[in-house]
């Protein structure tokens, strides 16, 4: 036969444990949701600022090229003066160390004296063909030059007043662009790379060996899945292969900036909090179990005493003493038993007298 204390503990303790576990679980998922939302906002803000910085960097270089182009078009220099202008830009900026160069429709390439730029067939080059399609200088798609370097070029038609069709151009190394891309990352532990959505090629990446490779040809599942989203034109923030991933279009270009951070890093702190919460929950359950046991013990002790008295009375012993101190239901019960014992004693005494 189970005692009241055992029954109460058997009912209350499991409910207490369930409540503590549920509260711990709810707290964990709320914390995880808050951290996830915060991280998404931080990654979105980071990639937006990063895109703006890259756009500003590209525009700054493009503006420099445009100034040089307009200077040549307005001054219409002779060959010697043109060389002097090109020499002034060669080595002037680390972003385009070879400065500017010009090719005409006859295949003549004009470069600065100290420039290392080489092109055996300028009129067949990417930069020349793209330059023929526009007056204002714009960036080409990425390509590999004769030196085997991955570059992009800013090119456009040069109107220097001569009867010969000319294109002016300048090269930016993709390795240099990679440095710029990764230097603007604001979120700790996040990484970024630049993609050309036309062919899925990587324009900038922390790992230089990845530059000019295609996302679809990568052995990395994450890069392949990113390539699939880029190909679909889906640039919404999402989780891809365990990475929170954000996309941003670079204004003035066709490029897509991809920034990502492993979710394991994001949830590292919340997982620690979960472990701490479980530990606190277990300690709380133990403390509550002890407190509940003590409360039940002191609450039902008068009932146990009354049970003992009633048992003695059923055995014919009316000499028992009932001590009642409380004013609750148990106290009223005790006083009733006390009155009954007193009445029975009187009846027994009258019988014997």
Where is each model-derived feature located?
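Extreme N-terminal signal-anchor transmembrane helix of membrane signaling/transducer proteins, especially
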Residues: 2-33, 37
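Cytoplasm-proximal transmembrane signaling helix
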Residues: 12, 16, 256-258, 263-314, ...
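Extracytoplasmic/periplasmic sensory segments of membrane signal-transduction proteins
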Residues: 41-48, 53-138
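Solvent-exposed, extracytoplasmic
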Residues: 78-94, 167-210
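Extracytoplasmic/periplasmic ligand-binding sensor regions of membrane-associated signaling proteins
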Residues: 91-96, 105, 110-184, 188, ...
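Extracellular/periplasmic juxtamembrane segments that couple receptor/chemosensory ectodomains to their
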Residues: 198, 208-209, 217-275
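Amphipathic coiled-coil signaling helices used for dimeric signal transmission
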Residues: 325-353
